[in-house]
Amino acid sequence: MVVKPAARGMKPQGQAYKDKSKPADIRQSNINAAKAVSDAIRTSLGPRGMDKMIQAANGEVTITNDGATILKQMNVIHPAAKMLVELSRAQDVEAGDGTTSVVVVAGALLKAVEKLLQMGIHPTAISDAFQKCSAKAVDILTEMSTPIELTDRESLVKSASTSLNSKVVSQHSSQLAPIAVEAVLKVTEAGHESGVDLKNVKIIRSLGGTIDDTELVDGLVFTQRSCGVNGPKRVEKAKIGLIQFCISAPKTDMDHSVIVSDYAAMDRVLKEERAYILNIVKQIKKAGCNVLLVQKSILRDAVSDLAMHFLDKIKVMVVKDIEHEDIEFVCKTLNCRPIASLDHFLPEHLVNADLVEEVSSGSSKFVKVTGIQNMGQTVSIVVRGSNKLVLEEAERSLHDALCVVRCLVKKRAQIAGGGAPEIEMAIQLAAHAQTLEGVDAYCFRAFANALEVIPSTLAENAGLNPIATVTELRNRHAQGEKNAGINVRKGAITDILAENVVQPLLVSTSSITLASETVRSILKIDDIINTMQ
């Protein structure tokens, strides 16, 4: 028997074939997908950034330049690209602003990673070095920052204005910024500044007027109008009752029905219904209630036509169909509990307020409650606008401004904007790289160069020469001008602090930390496995 020699290059039996190029290909695919997402929203960065028009499958159109909103509505399929969408969402939750910057920085860091991998540096070594870079960058930002106090209202307004200046509603920043500051300070509890809950600030959109007509209401605002045709539209010294039961005839459940065979039985049914509703209305009058807030019911009418007739007669103002999710906010504002049963509809469960009135705003009407006794720490903002698209973008912009003020309340320090902190970090990290040896030196230098993407993009979007602008910025910072940044309005490099372009320290530190963490996560992935389900 002749044994033939094994073919050259064949693997011994039992040993699996291993494709050494696969991890590199997967990593490259992930980097390319994430860079594509970053490049897609890069043009919307800064005050001179472009807006995006997003059209949903149902034909609904959104116009915005808010990074989180663009990415949330973008149809992203690649898992690595989805990581950048999640990164933007994480920045939105943590800081509320800087959602575009964080994705642009992550994209620049991934380009730096690509070059480092081509040099043959191991992904784990790059990941560890980037972690050190991130920590060093946060230290540099903290050193650059200026501490502020909550009593310094002017500084808070400046930061809110900077956030609004990059939005569609930038021309109204002088009107919206003080509203955002006032709202956050009103809901901030003494001693619990770190936990400012923006759910205590309710933003109501009202079609009609302009954004300049936006107002802060120290009380409650309902988008519903008062129900009664002949009922009161304005009630002074109001006694408010918030109920969760219906003022209408009870109905059988879905499995049962009532059959009426003759007119006498029909009369009895109507008579019973009238007596039932009249009893409820008498109890409401006896308690001294003159404003009734009724929760929406999915089973039957919250307030029947007959009930409205009786309530109009006793001059009770009725606001019905209050959504279930709004009840918590209403209770917190009125500092009361909802009345779930007629037996508990007593005078001591009512809330006193100076004024409840129905207000007209363009073509829409809403009910405003002011002067509430023992009011909870909540506030309402009525946003006005000429059309739905403007209203939605104004609400998003106002939310970002509220988040910026919340950041300053949580971490009371601010830094210059206009690309100044990024250039300062780049210069200091590059200088630190000179003191290092080996892989860390390469990685620190690459990280420093990547941070220059922010001033470069700001200059590009403002129609300036990015290379010349970044070079001049470097020179100014090298001469010790730490606050020199790009003034896009003047098209020049100026002292950004003197121009009042400031942002919270938390926005920048969060942006650097989250971007580097995401890049490190993408870097460490060497395979994508699809499951059966």
Swiss-Prot record:
Alphabetized InterPro entries for the sequence: Chap_CCT_delta, Chaperone_TCP-1, Chaperonin_TCP-1_CS, Cpn60/GroEL/TCP-1, GroEL-like_apical_dom_sf, GROEL-like_equatorial_sf, TCP-1-like_intermed_sf, TCP-1_chaperonin
UniProt entry keywords in alphabetical sequence: ATP-binding, Chaperone, Cytoplasm, Nucleotide-binding
Pfam families hit by this protein: Cpn60_TCP1 (PF00118)
Calcium recorded as keyword: no
Subcellular location: Cytoplasm
Superkingdom per UniProt: Eukaryota
An annotated Gene Ontology molecular function: ATP hydrolysis activity
Subunit structure: Heterooligomeric complex of about 850 to 900 kDa that forms two stacked rings, 12 to 16 nm in diameter.
Family: Belongs to the TCP-1 chaperonin family.
Official protein name in the record: T-complex protein 1 subunit delta
